[in-house]
Amino acid sequence: MKNYRKYAKQYFLPKEVCRDWVARDALDEAPVWCSVDLRDGNQALVDPMVVEEKIEMFQYLIKLGFKEIEVGFPAASQIEFDFLRHLIEHDMIPDDVYVQVLTQCREELIARTFESIQGCKQAIVHIYNSTSTLQRDVVFHMDRPHIVDIAVKGTELVKKYAADFPGKIVLEYSPESFTG
């Protein structure tokens, strides 16, 4: 039984947790759904969608009533960059729809992401970084405060680029593969 420690708690809860919603009978308002069907990323099909197919899918998602649509990872994919530029340059994004773009917390990727959304009226910039114990130890060779610093710096960069952006920017952050 020498390996029992590997099952130790590897997560933490926020200091002040409010879970009043658990006691409610029903939701007060409908949730906001964000479609992520257009991002190929590392979940790509063997033959990923081309710009024309993405346009067709985007128009279908609009028809279905989605108000938030993740259009991809434009800093990492030229197809997704070109697709987003096409939507903006051809005024295909309705005024009540937010396009969402995904990027890692790295300055060159955040800069390229903001380049991709120039001319967009409103966008959600979704940043992320790896936070799992295994990845921070084995891949990044960093301790927890350094990983937190990556997220903080990414947030500061989005804030910096958003200050010069003529449209509305919403920041979204996610830990990637959170396990500790």
For the regions a language model picked out, list residue spans one by one.
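Catalytic domains of carbohydrate-active enzymes, especially glycoside hydrolases
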Residues: 53-74
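Glycine-rich, proline-tolerant flexible connector loops at the mouths of alpha/beta enzymes
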Residues: 67-93, 97, 101-102, 127-139, ...
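Acidic (Asp/Glu)-rich catalytic clusters
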Residues: 85-94, 112-123, 156-166
